[in-house]
Amino acid sequence: SFGEKGYIDKVSHTIPEFYKELATNPIHPQTSQPVPGDFKRQYQFLSSHYKSILSIHIPNSVSGTMQSAQTAVKRVSGSSVTILDSLNISVGQGLIVTHAARMVKAGKSHDEIVEGINYARENTKVFCCIKDLSYGVKGGRVPGSVKVIADILRISPILTTSSNGKLEKAGAVLGKKNLGKKMVKYMKNKHDVSK
């Protein structure tokens, strides 16, 4: 939401509309998790069409979304819903969900898919480089002093998720230009990319 104006991600506000408002609205957007009732309705609908449901979420450490889903499952009778923590955010979660979808398409059983998701989340690691900390400061997640120091030293922090799903600093690169190339170099230097 931007102040009093609320939106449902990619439903009532397209991605280009969001970024346009982000650039022009002086109010910083805030997110909120879906309420258990939203999950309950989805689970009831899906239960009427499928034998089992896999619900894959971003970690509890960064959002209460999974907790809302767990609360909703307790209110849905006669369904087989498995709530899974992806231990990843953004692209990492998307890769895990895509892996699960491929397993469904391949005809794997519910238990085989859960096992595959657990394997995928243990082997999925995403790194991102933050060019500008302004939105982190506006959202209250980054102290203003950290942004000032990063700007003065021209440092771009690299973030990742820990093994328990918490967002953490992985490193940093110098400069604000050619971050893609710098990230590739960072990955080659710090991590065995041959696996």
Residue ranges and their predicted role:
Residues 1-5, 61-82, 88-98, 102-195:
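Mixed-charge interfacial surface used for oligomerization/domain docking
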Residues 1-33:
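N-terminal glycine-rich anion-binding loop in soluble enzyme alpha/beta folds
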Residues 30, 55, 83:
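Short catalytic-loop micro-motif centered on adjacent basic/acidic residues
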Residues 31-42:
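Glycine-rich, highly charged phosphate/nucleotide-binding loops
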Residues 40-51, 186-194:
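Glycine-rich phosphate/diphosphate-binding loops that line cofactor/substrate pockets in enzymes
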Residues 52-61:
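Short, glycine-/small-residue-enriched flexible loop/hinge segments at domain edges that mediate gating
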